[in-house]
Every structure is written in C-alpha cells, then in structure tokens.
Amino acid sequence: MNATRRQRLWWVICVLTAAALAVTLIVFALQRNMSYLFTPSQVSAGEAAGYQQFRLGGMVKAGSIQRAGDSLKVSFTVIDKNAATQVEYTGILPDLFRDNQSVIANGRMQGGRFVANEVLAKHDETYMPKELKDAMAEGHAGKPIPATATPLTAPR
C-alpha cells in the first residue's frame, strides 16, 4: 500500500469515526429529552416503572383539588377509565385547570404519588393528544370527547 492510499484510508476512517460519534451523541441527547405519555391505568399496571421522567394524562377528579394555605403546593387526582393517580405540584396552575378537565402533568413517580414539575390544562374544546383521547374515550363520565378532537401532531 503506497503512502497516498494509506493517507486516504486514514481520513476515511477518521471521518467515519467522527460521524459514528456524532450520531451516538445525538441519540443519547434525544433519549434524555423524550417524555412518554402514560394514563393512570398504565401507571398502576407498572408500564411507567422504567421511566424516570414521563407525562401523566387524564382528567382531574371532581373534588380532589387540595391547595396548601401557606404555599403554592397543590395536590389532585388524575383519573382515567380504570385507575387514579395522586399528583402533587408546587407552582402556579394554568387558568383553565379545574375539576373534570383534561390535564397533562410532566414529572416522576415518588413514593406512590406523581410529583409534577409542569402541569398543562386543555386549552380549548378540540385539543387532546390522540393517545390520551383514545385512552379516555371509554371512561369519561362528563361531556363526550368530540370525534373531531385535534391530534397533538396536527398543524394549527
């Protein structure tokens, strides 16, 4: 093998190694930022056990909202068709947050309860992530979920 071929081979190996390293770093960064959506039924079945951080979606159970008098700490129960999960959140809740309203909380399980670091309330009558709409369609005791509910991925 002559010197020119050896140098060319060396550059090809370096470029491929750098590309592989870049792809690996991108994949790890994306995995760390992914947040999966689970319903209370899936959480109680243990499907969310392997995830440090995930989203919990469902309806706020009527009468379950309890606010601490001396802080911004709020606890409430998120329900779906078969299960309920207790949620704790410290912070200012969205204006649309109330009983029997669709909610998505981002956080982690801690000691049998979900500790949220972010709470999102349904912003209008047509918004609901498709997977949450499908999971909630059978058990929602309030108003029916419209068939025209906009999926999360649909452009607005």
UniProtKB/Swiss-Prot annotation:
Domain of life, source organism: Bacteria
Location of the region described as Disordered in the Swiss-Prot/TrEMBL record: 137-156
Cytoplasmic topological domain residue ranges: 1-8
Parts of the chain on the Periplasmic side: 30-156
Keyword match Heme: yes
Biased composition (Low complexity): 146-156
GO BP terms: cytochrome complex assembly
Transmembrane segments: 9-29
GO cellular component: plasma membrane
Molecular function in Gene Ontology: heme binding; metal ion binding
InterPro entries with a match to the protein in the record: CcmE, CcmE-like_sf, NA-bd_OB-fold
Chain sites annotated for binding heme: H123, Y127
Coiled coil regions, renumbered to chain: none
NCBIfam families according to UniProt: PRK13159.1, PRK13254.1-1, PRK13254.1-3, PRK13254.1-5
Function: Heme chaperone required for the biogenesis of c-type cytochromes. Transiently binds heme delivered by CcmC and transfers the heme to apo-cytochromes in a process facilitated by CcmF and CcmH.
Name by which UniProt lists this protein: Cytochrome c-type biogenesis protein CcmE 1
Organism: Xanthomonas euvesicatoria pv. vesicatoria (strain 85-10)
Gene (name only): ccmE1
